[in-house]
UniProtKB/Swiss-Prot annotation:
Pathway: Secondary metabolite biosynthesis. Its EC number is 1.-.-.-. This is Oxidoreductase GME11367. Induction: The expression of the dibenzodioxocinones biosynthesis cluster is positively regulated by the transcription factor dibT. One of its GO terms (molecular function) is monooxygenase activity. Oxidoreductase; part of the gene cluster that mediates the biosynthesis of dibenzodioxocinones such as pestalotiollide B, a novel class of inhibitors against cholesterol ester transfer protein (CEPT). The biosynthesis initiates from condensation of acetate and malonate units catalyzed by the non-reducing PKS pks8/GME11356. Pks8/GME11356 lacks a thioesterase (TE) domain, which is important to the cyclizing of the third ring of atrochrysone carboxylic acid, and the esterase GME11355 might play the role of TE and catalyzes the cyclization reaction of the C ring. Keywords: Monooxygenase, Oxidoreductase.
Length: 262
């Protein structure tokens, strides 16, 4: 019986992870969120579900994370944002708390305990191998449109790689994402594709976590479609445009709308 911790369970990826994990017989979910009411409104299937335990609280609460991560096979770290927030540090803060929690959990469990794998949701845009086929004119636009988010992810990755002598991390790096149905996916160490549905991304993350051979451990992993691409998200042009404004004119941040791929 596998138990998965989903950190960021109210986000698009997090919600899909919870749904797909619960489709597995006997699988359990530890869902972390900052607002339980928001989570239950978005995912009513978890209400009174004995296979789901919700952990509500601050991203800086180490003891809460210790309880959330205890007994888990894998930790899906999906705490991020679609907005190019100046000075974004959500991923760094999450990783810092996770590492502190796992250090504490390791001490509590002793040498016989097991530490869960971490699957960090990152981006193919910051992987020059996976994104090598991205049009040369478009790549700098994307890097600027989400520059603050990518800088945050880069630091988070560095923090996790610095602990690779005792922590196993899988770096999931999809291309563009879409609110679409699940069509089928493939994991790849060589390619990425846009657009991927959030459901296919979630399924790919679960597959990587469950791989008994550890083929994806400590690697950058792309996701490609197996049965046709996801639809183009109509919110993408606005998301890019507003992201560029936040990149070049960060003082405009509070006056700009929140955007997303929908």
């Amino acid at each position: 019986m596998a138990t998965y911790a989903v950190l960021g369970s109210t986000g698009n990826t997090g919600k899909c992870l919870v749904e797909l994990a619960l489709q597995q017989p006997n699988a359990k979910v530890h869902a972390y969120c900052r607002n339980k009411t928001k989570l239950t409104n978005q995912l009513p299937i978890i209400i009174d579900n004995k296979r789901v335990e919700v952990f509500e609280g601050s991203i800086y609460d180490v003891d809460l994370f210790v309880d959330c991560l205890r007994g888990c096979r894998a930790v899906f770290l999906t705490i991020t944002t679609n907005d190019n927030v100046p000075g974004c540090h959500m991923s760094q803060d999450s990783v810092r708390t996770i590492i502190a929690a796992l250090v504490k959990l390791k001490k509590q469990q002793g040498p016989s305990g097991t530490i869960p794998k971490i699957l960090l949701l990152s981006s193919a845009t910051i992987d020059e191998h996976l994104n090598r086929d991205m049009p040369g004119w478009f790549k700098p636009i994307m890097k600027a449109a989400a520059s603050n988010v990518y800088d945050d992810l880069k630091v988070a990755e560095q923090m996790l790689r610095a602990e690779d002598d005792w922590l196993t991390t899988i770096y999931i790096k999809p291309g563009g994402l879409s609110l679409d149905v699940q069509r089928g996916h493939k994991l790849s160490l060589d390619k990425q594709e846009s657009f991927i549905s959030y459901y296919d991304l979630a399924a790919a993350m679960i597959e990587a976590a469950d791989d008994v051979e550890g083929r994806y451990d400590m690697k950058n992993v792309g996701v490609v479609n197996a049965n046709g691409g996801a639809r183009f998200p109509p919110g993408t042009p606005m998301c890019i445009a507003v992201g560029l404004l936040r990149h070049f004119f960060p003082w405009l941040h509070n006056y700009l709308p929140s955007t997303g791929p929908a």
